[in-house]
Amino acid sequence: NLGGEIRCDDTHTFSLSVNYNPWNFSGNKKMKHFLVQPEYRKWLNEAFTGSFIGLQVHYALYNFWGMLPWGFGNGKMLGIENRQIANNRYQGNLAGFGISYGYQWMISPQWNMEAGISLGYAHLNYKRYGQPAGAPLIEKSNCNYWGLTQIGISVVYFIQ
């Protein structure tokens, strides 16, 4: 994951985050994705200091097969039963928006630490394929998701 952020004025910034995971895991399991997420932030004090609230949009391409993201071991994820996710390949895209809250702590003049969380919406379009690799298309569908869209801790380095 890589991101950058620029100051617009004393209390507003604009950030752009890009996330990329190209790897396959053992047994041809995969959790591939490419995500772009711009965000506008309003800092409650001064930019890059203390609390901020933000508005973001996100777009991603994904290809999941044979494994569940984020430790979803029981129940459902995005309205799909876990055994379907573990036994099928889902390939598609998502687009959505969210609101965020975060906080930055100064570590030194060049370094900060940031913690943040976002809630929002994502519309997913996907194609579902069975096993093994190369299996035919089972269905084309979509679903809507409301909930946690991002959570993280970041190390921030200032380029001056």
What residues fall within each predicted segment?
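Outer-membrane beta-barrel "beta-signal"
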Residues: 145-160
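Residue-level detector of alpha-helical segments with a strong bias toward transmembrane helices
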Residues: 119, 128-130
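Solvent-exposed, glycine/polar-rich loop segments of beta-barrel outer-membrane systems
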Residues: 74-78, 130-141
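Gram-negative (and chloroplast) outer-membrane scaffold detector with strong preference
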Residues: 5-115, 154-157
